[in-house]
Each structure stands twice: as structure tokens, then as C-alpha cells.
Amino acid sequence: ALKYRDKVLKILKEHASESDITERSLSKAEYFSWINNTNEGTTESQTLANLNFFEWLRQEYGMQLDIYAFDAGLIDGKNIYGSINSQRFKNKFPKGLDSTYLKAKQNGVRLGLWGGPDGFGDTLESAEERKEMLVSLCRNYDWALFKFDAVCGPLREEKEDLFVDMIGECRKYSPDLILLNHRLGLKKAEQCATTFLWEGKESYIDVNSFNTCAAPHNRVGALGRGLVPDLKRLTEDHGVCLSSCLDYWEDELVLQAFNRSLLLSPQIYGNPWLLSDREFPKLARIFNLHRKFSGLLVDGIELPSAYGKYAVSRGDDKTRLITLRNLTWEPQKVKIVLNHEIGLEECKHVKCRLYHPVERILGIYNYGESVEVTVLPFRSMLFYASADESLDGIGVEGTDFEIIKDVAGKPIEINLLGFA
């Protein structure tokens, strides 16, 4: 693990990304379509149906997606490079990308793409055609993300200069273009990458991510993932799979969004429409809370071992968001000390509440006091402590609750869960 960490940090230091994105850039909420489609690729009608779903989440619950990324098969596929001028692409998208782009733009969403890093062919003409195709996505469609994957094939060393030049042209039109390096052995072209795939590992539950111990649900292996090297946010953890094994997905998403809080967070993929109707408010709530606190989540510290495994506190000197987890069969009590230990500077009073697994207003405490919380077996927790009253949100004292709807200009809906 230490060898892997040192290797990653060396790469990050030697090849700082030449984009407008830094370690302190705000996160982007992303969905990518892997498992909704696989290497066969998606279609225009399928994509528009998916975008309609996210439009509904936005209108109903205020959930805002930043990036909708096409996964494998839109243009490139496994071991093949394609073209938007091919008959294969035209059969799937008879109107090109115009309708999809306009639908996404109407909802404040930008598009992204899975593909391979090469595809330049062996002639100047083929190289220019490949370059123009990808640059045109940025020029014409305000492209947000390229995920280049070794599954499609490597980047030939003699083509690295072409690649660097192409990405430079792309960023003239999309300065904040995110380039994900998925297991590519890049050399000179590494300077173009925004993130790397943490541990080279994907997160499809029970396929790429699985339990290594007896547990009551299938996501314990995912909950047990550690912390990225030095809490570097320009890392990609492949997000949270919403397709199979849907129990306790929210615990994993809380850790993805608030514990690691990477550049792409919250990040989901698969088929979120398979969630039950009662779960959509929770999905939106996690996205909405992350957006509300996004400016605070760029800075984090790892907490002492007394807080449990991989506990992290994020925020500034007035407000902290703390993520805890329990990977055992017994409830674990944790004392959260409201002082510099969690990153709070001295103040008079601190307001505390839970956001997950339930919402609960815990009360107002003096600086330096401790708040004892109980983390349930094989669950995560999101705890909030703040001396900044301007960040206070709605809630109900004396009972656990969940926010169903909190959309500007619409009635607020709260579900009361029972008195504490």
C-alpha cells in the first residue's frame, strides 16, 4: 500500500495537469452510463429517456447533475476506435448529438465520453480526423469530460505528441475539461490527465467490489475502502454503482461524496431508476447537501483512530462535516470532540446535527464539549458541527426525520421518523 501511495504521489508531482482544475476545485456531480449500456453502446432515444429521469429529479427534488457521461460504445468500443461519421454511430444517433446536447443543456448538464487514447491511425489524414472529431465535441458541445480507458487500447508512444496537442486544442474551448486516466501507461501525455483511477479498481458491486468478510449486505467491501493517498481529490474512485445489490447504497454514496469528496462527487452509474420511489428523496438529498457544502468539502483531515476506521473531517474553522463508519457487527459509540481535533477553531457555541443515516438535530454545545454518537453496524454516518448560523437548514427538533423536498419556491416536505 505504501509503495502504491508513493508511486501515485510521484506521478501527481511530476505531471501536474495543464488544465484549469486544481485540488481545491469544486466537485462535479456525475452520472455515467456503464451497465445501462455496455460495449454495444447507447442510442439517442435511450439517452434522452435517461436525461428525462434526471430532469424529473431536478424538478421534483432539486437534484442537479453537472455531467452526464456516455460510457463504452458511443464512438469507441472494446479494442476498437470509431467515428461520429460512421454508419454505426448514425444508426444510433440519427440527428447526431444535437438533441442530446440541447436536452442536457436545458437542465444545466454537460456531456462526457468514454473512449480510447489513440485512434490516430498511421497517416497524417487519419490523425487529423481523430483530432478534429474530439476537438469538435468541445467546440460545438461544451464537452466536460473524456474518460480514456486501456480497455480500448494503449496510446502508442510515438502518438503522445499528437495526443498532447489534441487535448490542448480541446481545452481552448473547454478550459475545465476533465481527463480521466483509466489504467493508461502514459508518459509525456500524463501531463494532460486530471485524475487517475484509484487502485486501478472499478466498483461494480459483487463483480469488481465484493465483501471479504461475513456481512449483512453486499456493500461492506465498498464501505471498507480506505482513503486515497494524502486525501488527494484529483483521484477517481469509479463512483457508486446503482444497479445490482441496492441495499445500503446510500451509506456508500455518503462516503464517496463526503469522506473522499473527490473532483467527481457525488458520482453514480448504472440504473438509478431502479431505486424505489421512497429512495429518490434520499438520493437527491445527498446530492443537494454536497452542493450546499461544496466549498467546504475541498479541505479535509484524517481523524484519530478513536473515531474509527478512515474517519475524515472536512470544512473550515467554523464548520465541519465528519464521516464515520462501522465495519463490525456491534454498534460503536464515538465521542466527537468539538475543538481543534476535528478542525474547529475556538468559538462560543457549536450547533450539531446528523444528516445520515437519519437526520436529527442534536443541539447546541459549548466549544470543547464532546458529542457521543452511535454508528450502526456496517453503516456510515454524516455528522455536522458548525458555529456559522447562516448554514443552518430546516429540521424538526425532538425526533428523527428525513427531508423529502426542499426546493426553492415549493412547499417543504419532511417525513417524521419517530421521537428520540
Locations of regions flagged by a protein language model:
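Short intrinsically disordered coil segments
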Residues: L9-K10, T47, L338-N339, G398-I403
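Conserved structural scaffold segments of CAZyme catalytic domains across common CAZy folds
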Residues: A1-D118, E128, W273-P304, R314-T319, ...
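C-terminal beta-strand-rich structural cap/linker in extracellular carbohydrate-active enzymes
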Residues: L362-E413, L417-F419
